[in-house]
Amino acid sequence: MKRALRALLSIGLLMSCQVHARELRVCADPNNLPYSDEAGEGFENRIVELIARDLGAHVDYTWWAQRRGAIRNTLNAGACDVIPGMASSSGMSGTTDPYYRSTYVFVSRADHGLQSLASLDDPRLRTLRIGVQLVGDDGANPPPAMSLARRGIVDNVRGYTVYGDYADKAPQAPVIDAVARGDIDVAVVWGPTAGYFASRAGVPMVLAPVTPWLDGPQSPMVFDISMGVRRNDRALRRELDRALLRERPAIERILDAYHVPRVPMMAVAPVPSP
């Protein structure tokens, strides 16, 4: 009888701990590989889970397509506390210390002899068939599209929407698939997208960081990536900063597994005690 009572008490305590376990409330896109998806197969999913374990928490996702207005309607509306994969320079929320820095890259087939293509000023870009990712027609397109347009490189450029076909499992893959098929000669794509899909293209591909890294004040080619938090949530930001620092080697292994190209980050100072 006593053993049965002890067992019941143990079960009750376990259930109580589970009910009161800490939640890390995260907003993420349910169909945006290689970053995140509802099956948890993206590298941001894996990094979020890693950080949650470090904090003794479990992840509670709110799924929301990464479109304009997403931060306003999720993080800033209180639907979640964290959004992974935000540019550190974003002015739409607070951000943690960066956990990686990536770059736009030129992507070409290894058998097309374009390994030396690395600069937006390379004269070959005036005749090559180029693929770029586009957001819309309101001037808010990614930096490579704007940089090419400023150079008058327009007629030989083909656009692929950065959102892709949301009915597909990999909406951002088409621009890399087009390079692999030979429909275009080179694509200029954000590094994590390029690295992931190029590694799965079925033909050897070459990636080269785009230079210059800063092509005018409105066209940086390199971005630090952080987790987004509300500006006034300083305590959570400090916690995340410490966890990101502790887990940096594991984060690097995750990024390697997803073929994310990186450029060196400046050293991050230790997070002061609250």
What function would you assign to each model-found segment?
Residues 21-92, 132, 165-170, 176-177, ...:
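Extracytoplasmic small-molecule ligand-binding "clamshell" domains
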Residues 51, 74-76, 123, 178-180, ...:
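Hydrophobic residues within well-ordered alpha-helices
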Residues 58, 64, 132, 136-163, ...:
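Ligand-binding clefts/hinges and TM-proximal coupling segments of bilobed small-molecule sensing domains
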